[in-house]
Amino acid sequence: MGLPFIVLNYKTYLQGTGQGAMEIAKACKAVSEESGVEIAVAPQLPDIYRVASEVALPVFSQHLDGIGAGSFTGHVFGKCIKEAGAVGTLINHSEKRLTLAEIEASLKAAKEFGLRSIICTNNVPTTAAAAVLGPDYVAIEPPELIGSGIPVSKADPEVVSGSVEAVAKINPRVKVLCGAGISKGEDLRAALDLGSQGVLLASGIVKATDPKAALEDLIRLI
């Protein structure tokens, strides 16, 4: 197994807003260059262009709507985020839930504009359903553990291993990420040992006093 893929979701944390978004992205780039680990960031929409323009690392959108050009006020258009510099998008995060039809439409839009896709799920059945759709990644995140500081890899390891097994049976080209409560090296190591190929995390890094040090701790056991 190669090095893991780490995706850092800024959410709307103050520490990851505006200039803070830039500083965290620079920390991610430094750690990525030092370690060889691919680290992507998902800043707020208005910060995508700035981060993508000034820091050479993968930038994801936190959301994408399954719409095209036209009368869709307030929606997130795939072509717009692609031209702003995004290379991928989260879909169906537990804080931005979508219906199955909306997930399919968002994934279709991501594929249309060449964006890497991460569909977030909350249990093994939803992971299996997401795998059928054929995204690049599914990220298993039980919502009750998000932001808790309690890693899913320890609190509910079966949901991770079960998701890995389900995806392998349905569509082995889809990669599995592990999320919810991930913040330390032990958490990432446990997630990888359960079969995931990376992690989706947020507060443990974004809200850290020293994000670079927190990232270095995260990868120290791989």
Swiss-Prot record:
One Gene Ontology cellular component annotation held by this UniProt entry: cytoplasm
Documented EC number(s): 5.3.1.1
Top-level class of the enzyme under EC nomenclature: isomerase
Binding site for substrate: 9-11, 146, 181, 202-203
Catalytic residue positions: 93 (electrophile), 141 (proton acceptor)
GO biological process: gluconeogenesis; glycolytic process
Gene3D superfamilies: Aldolase class I
Transmembrane segments: none
Cellular localisation: Cytoplasm
Disulphide-bridged cysteine pairs: none
UniProt xrefs under Pfam families: TIM
InterPro entries documented for this protein: Aldolase_TIM, TIM_sf, Triosephosphate_isomerase, Triosephosphate_isomerase_arc
SUPFAM superfamilies: Triosephosphate isomerase (TIM)
Function summary: Involved in the gluconeogenesis. Catalyzes stereospecifically the conversion of dihydroxyacetone phosphate (DHAP) to D-glyceraldehyde-3-phosphate (G3P).
Quaternary structure annotation from Swiss-Prot or TrEMBL: Homotetramer; dimer of dimers.
Name used for this protein in its record: Triosephosphate isomerase
Designated gene of the protein: tpiA
